[in-house]
C-alpha cells in the first residue's frame, strides 16, 4: 500500500519540482536549472508548498480516478467512457499548468456519452508525450501477468483518446508496463527487453481493433527503432547485462544526450523519449531520490513529464526512502493522490478480469 501511495505522490512531486510553476519546464538549459537549484539550497531544501502541479498530474489523476470509478471487473466500454469523461472534465483545471495542445484540443473533441465517442481519428502530428505522462497508474491497476492484454489495450486506448499516433500511445504503454514491472519487483535492466517483446502484441491489438489500422502501421517503426537503438547503446537489449553509461555524463552531457533522443530537439517531449529519459534516470539512480531528480527532473528538456513518469516508477520501488518531506508534504492534491492510490491498491491487489468491448 505504501508503495502505491509513494507512486502517486512522488509522481506529482516530481512533476511539481520539474515544472517549478512553468519556470523550469521551459528553460532549455540544464546547467542554468542546476545553478538555480543550488541557489535554492538543493533538492532537500525545496518545499513544494507553492509549486503547482502541471497538466501531467491533473491528467494522471484523471486516469487514476476513472480507473477507480470503473471498479472491479469493469466493462471496457464503461472504463473508456469514464476515461474520456475525466479527460474532458480535467481541462477545467488547466489554468497556469501549461497543458499540451493535442491534449486540450482532442479532449474537447471527445463525446463520452455516445457509442465510441472516446475515439478520435489518426493524426500524424500526435506523437507528443501527453499520453505517456498520464498512464503510469494503469500499471498499478492491472499489474498481474494475467492482465497484460488488458494493460496493453487500456494504455493504448487511453493514449489515443488524445494522441492517435503510435509514437504517442506506445509511450503510454511503456509508462504503464514499467509501473507494472516495478510492482512485481522486476529489475529495471529487464524492462526495456520486456517492452520490445510486447510491441508485437500491441501491434496485433491495433490490427484487431480495426481503427485506422493502415495509418498506424505506417508510422509504427519510429518508436520501436528509437527504443532498440537506446537499449543497444546502454547494452541492455538482452535484458541481462548491467547498463553502461559514458564516463563523463554530467548535466551538460545529459542535456545533449536527451536532445539527441528527441524528435524535435526538446528532450522528453514525445511519447518515445519521455519514458526513455525517465528509464535512463531510474537505471542510473538506483535507490537515490536525489540522483533520480538530478537526471529526470532537472534538465533542459520537457522536465516535468520525465519527472512525473520517473517519480512514479521510483516510488513503487523505494517508497519514500530518503525523500525530504518538504518535497511532498504540502504538495497540491496530496490527499486526492493518496486516496486514489489506496483505492488503486485495493483494486490492483486482486487479479480480476475485464469485460472486453
Swiss-Prot record:
Its EC number is 3.2.2.19. One of its GO terms (molecular function) is ADP-ribosylarginine hydrolase activity. Its cofactor is Mg(2+). GO terms for biological process: protein de-ADP-ribosylation; protein modification process. Keywords: Hydrolase, Magnesium, Metal-binding. Binds 2 magnesium ions per subunit. This is ADP-ribosylhydrolase ARH1. It catalyses: N(omega)-(ADP-D-ribosyl)-L-arginyl-[protein] + H2O = ADP-D-ribose + L-arginyl-[protein]; alpha-NAD(+) + H2O = ADP-D-ribose + nicotinamide + H(+). Mg(2+) 1 binds at residues 54-56, 304. InterPro entries: ADP-ribosylarg_hydro, ADP-ribosylglycohydrolase, Ribosyl_crysJ1, Ribosyl_crysJ1_sf. Specifically acts as an arginine mono-ADP-ribosylhydrolase by mediating the removal of mono-ADP-ribose attached to arginine residues on proteins. Changing residue 55 to N: Complete loss of activity. Monomer. Mg(2+) 2 binds at residues 302, 304-305. It is an enzyme of class 3 (hydrolase). Substrate binds at residues 85, 101-103, 124, 130, 163-165, 263-265, 269-270. Changing residue 54 to A: Complete loss of activity. GO terms for cellular component: extracellular space. Belongs to the ADP-ribosylglycohydrolase family. It comes from the Eukaryota.
Amino acid at each position: 500500500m505504501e508503495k502505491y501511495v509513494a507512486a502517486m505522490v512522488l509522481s506529482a512531486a516530481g512533476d511539481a519540482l520539474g515544472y517549478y510553476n512553468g519556470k523550469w519546464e521551459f528553460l532549455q538549459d540544464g546547467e542554468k536549472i542546476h545553478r538555480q537549484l543550488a541557489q535554492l539550497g538543493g533538492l532537500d531544501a525545496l518545499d513544494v508548498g507553492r509549486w503547482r502541479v502541471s497538466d501531467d498530474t491533473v491528467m494522471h489523476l484523471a486516469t487514476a480516478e476513472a480507473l477507480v470509478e470503473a471498479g472491479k471487473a469493469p466493462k471496457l466500454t464503461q472504463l473508456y467512457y469514464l476515461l474520456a469523461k475525466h479527460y474532458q472534465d480535467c481541462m477545467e483545471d488547466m489554468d497556469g499548468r501549461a497543458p499540451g495542445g493535442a491534449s486540450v484540443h482532442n479532449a474537447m473533441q471527445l463525446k463520452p456519452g455516445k457509442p465510441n465517442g472516446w475515439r478520435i481519428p489518426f493524426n500524424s502530428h500526435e506523437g507528443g508525450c501527453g499520453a505517456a505522462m498520464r498512464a503510469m497508474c494503469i500499471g498499478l491497476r492491472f499489474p498481474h501477468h494475467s492482465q497484460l492484454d488488458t494493460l496493453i489495450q487500456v494504455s493504448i486506448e487511453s493514449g489515443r483518446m488524445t494522441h492517435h499516433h503510435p509514437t504517442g500511445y506506445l509511450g503510454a504503454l511503456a509508462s504503464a508496463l514499467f509501473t507494472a514491472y516495478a510492482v512485481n519487483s522486476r529489475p529495471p535492466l529487464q524492462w526495456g527487453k520486456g517492452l520490445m517483446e510486447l510491441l508485437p502484441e500491441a501491434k496485433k491489438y491495433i490490427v484487431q481493433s480495426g481503427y485506422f489500422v493502415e495509418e498506424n502501421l505506417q508510422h509504427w517503426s519510429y518508436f520501436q527503432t528509437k527504443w532498440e537503438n537506446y537499449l543497444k547503446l546502454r547494452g541492455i537489449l538482452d535484458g541481462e547485462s548491467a547498463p553502461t553509461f559514458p564516463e563523463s555524463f554530467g548535466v551538460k552531457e545529459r542535456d545533449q544526450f536527451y536532445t539527441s533522443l528527441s524528435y524535435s530537439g526538446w528532450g522528453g517531449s514525445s511519447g518515445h523519449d519521455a519514458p526513455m529519459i525517465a528509464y535512463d534516470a531510474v537505471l542510473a539512480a538506483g535507490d537515490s531520490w536525489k540522483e533520480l531528480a538530478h537526471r529526470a527532473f532537472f534538465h533542459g528538456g520537457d522536465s516535468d513529464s520525465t519527472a512525473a513518469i520517473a517519480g512514479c516508477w521510483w516510488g513503487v520501488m523505494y517508497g519514500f526512502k530518503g525523500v525530504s518531506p518538504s518535497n511532498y508534504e504540502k504538495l497540491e492534491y496530496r490527499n486526492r493522490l493518496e486516496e486514489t492510490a489506496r483505492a488503486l491498491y485495493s483494486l490492483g491487489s486482486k487479479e480480476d478480469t475485464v469485460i472486453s468491448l
